[in-house]
Amino acid sequence: MAEHAVAEEADREARAQIERAMAYGIEPTHLDVHNSALWGTPALFQVYLELGRDYKLPILISSDGIAKVTPEYQSMLSEDDIVLDRVIMMARDTPVENWVPEYEKLFASVEPGVTQLIIHFGFDDAELRAMAVDRPNPNAAWRQSDFDFFTSAEFKSLVAKNDIQLISWREIRKLLRD
C-alpha cells in the first residue's frame, strides 16, 4: 500500500474518518492503523503522528516497534508523544490446543511498563467464516479462540498471577489531555 499512497490524500481521508466518527458522537480513544498502514514511509508516519497530535489522541506506537523500522522514525517523535514500551500478541501459527499455555508464557514475559496485547475477538460463525475464507490467522476460528480465552476465568487468573494492571486507551488519552 505504501508505495502507492500519497501522504496528503492519506491525511485527508484519515481526518475525514475521525471527523465523521466524532460527528456521530463517537469519542475516539486512540488511533491505530490496520497492519501498520501509516508506517510504510516517513511521510505516512508523519501523517500518523500529526493526526495523534492534532486530535490529542494517543497512537499505537511502541519502543520495540519503532526500533524495527528506521532511525528516522525515532527522530520524528517529540517528547510529548506517548510511546508504549512494547506490543505483543499470540503467534499466528499457535494451534488452538496450545492457546492457554502459550498465553501463560506470553503473560509471564510481560515486563514493567506499558504493553499492548493485540487480540482478535470474533465469533466462528457463517458471517465471519465467509469474510475470512482462505485467510490465514487470525481467521474465524482464531477469533473465536481469542474470545473464549479472554472471557474465561483462566484469563482473569493469569492477570492476577502475573500482577498485570489492565488499563485502557481512555486512560492513556487522558495523559495527553490533562
PLM regions: where:
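Structural motif corresponding to alpha-helix initiation and N-cap regions
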Residues: 100-104, 152
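Conserved, mostly hydrophobic/aromatic
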Residues: 31, 117, 159
